[in-house]
């Protein structure tokens, strides 16, 4: 990092936002009561008050099963809320980093590159792609597609037939923060680690008694293989 940057994070009380706040003592993370992203005026007021150099937009409706139950609410938060952030940031020329998801891909081949065809398979993925579309309208922005887990795997079951580049938050979050601080990195980038099944990830994170789960056992239509081609990431973050 060449100079100090003032960073504002939306969704600072969430899993990712909380961890990002720990990485830099001066991160600003206004509570939802102050910055409801569905309130365009509140977003503008916060950016004028804190005058950040970078906004990392983590706030989102993130649970695919819950999104299936409340798709309209999810679309509002993930698309309209993101559009409010984009407009306010662009009017003030503030760098915007948007946290997206690997679920924007169909999941039929894996090893996805940033420019590969997008084909969401559930409401959650569509809502996050809608947010991406809003962010793409602003040149001073970075879309980070990623997937992460708490460092302690939180579930009793894990998919044996779903493959991903997901990893522990302690691995993913520092890379996100590093990229957010690089003004020359714009567009879209994939962040993750090697391809693995979700069960393999659970075992890696110490969940030795995790039970098998299969894609056919759930109703929210998760994609089968959203693993990433990480060439772009490695070229940027190489030592």
Provide a role label for each language-model segment.
Residues 38, 69, 73-84, 118, ...:
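Glycine-rich NAD(P)-binding loop of the Rossmann-fold in SDR/ketoreductase-type enzymes
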Residues 155-183, 187:
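Substrate-positioning beta->alpha
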Residues 119-147:
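Active-site Tyr-X1-5-Lys
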Residues 175-225:
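Mid/C-terminal beta-alpha module of Rossmann-like enzyme folds, strongest
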Residues 2-24:
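N-terminal Rossmann NAD(P)H-binding glycine-rich loop of SDR-like oxidoreductase domains
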Residues 84-119:
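Conserved Rossmann-fold NAD(P)-dependent oxidoreductase catalytic core, especially the SDR/UDP-sugar
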Residues 40-77, 88:
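NAD(P)H-binding glycine-rich loop region in Rossmannoid oxidoreductase-like domains
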Residues 25-46:
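Adenosine-cofactor binding site in Rossmann-like domains, unifying the SAM/SAH pocket
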């Amino acid at each position: 990092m060449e100079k100090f940057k003032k960073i504002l994070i939306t969704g600072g009380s969430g899993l990712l936002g909380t961890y990002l706040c720990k990485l830099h003592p001066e991160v600003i993370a206004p509570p939802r009561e102050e910055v409801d992203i569905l309130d365009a005026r509140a977003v503008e007021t916060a950016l004028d008050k804190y005058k950040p150099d970078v906004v990392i937009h983590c706030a989102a409706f993130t649970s695919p099963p819950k999104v299936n139950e409340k798709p309209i609410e999810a679309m509002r938060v993930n698309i309209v809320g993101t559009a409010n952030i984009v407009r306010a940031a662009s009017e003030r020329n503030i760098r915007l980093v948007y946290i997206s998801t690997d679920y924007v891909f169909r999941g039929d081949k894996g090893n996805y590159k940033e420019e590969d065809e997008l084909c969401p398979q559930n409401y959650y993925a569509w809502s996050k792609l809608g947010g991406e579309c809003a962010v793409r309208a602003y040149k001073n922005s970075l879309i980070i597609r990623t997937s992460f887990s708490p460092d302690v795997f939180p579930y009793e079951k894990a998919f044996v037939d779903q493959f991903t580049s997901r990893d522990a938050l302690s691995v993913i979050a520092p890379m996100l923060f590093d990229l957010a601080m690089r003004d020359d990195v714009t567009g879209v980038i994939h962040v993750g680690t090697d391809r693995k099944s979700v069960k393999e990830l659970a075992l890696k994170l110490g969940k030795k008694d995790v039970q098998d789960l299969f894609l056919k056992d759930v109703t929210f239509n998760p994609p089968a293989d959203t693993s990433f081609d990480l060439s772009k990431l490695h070229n940027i973050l190489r030592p």
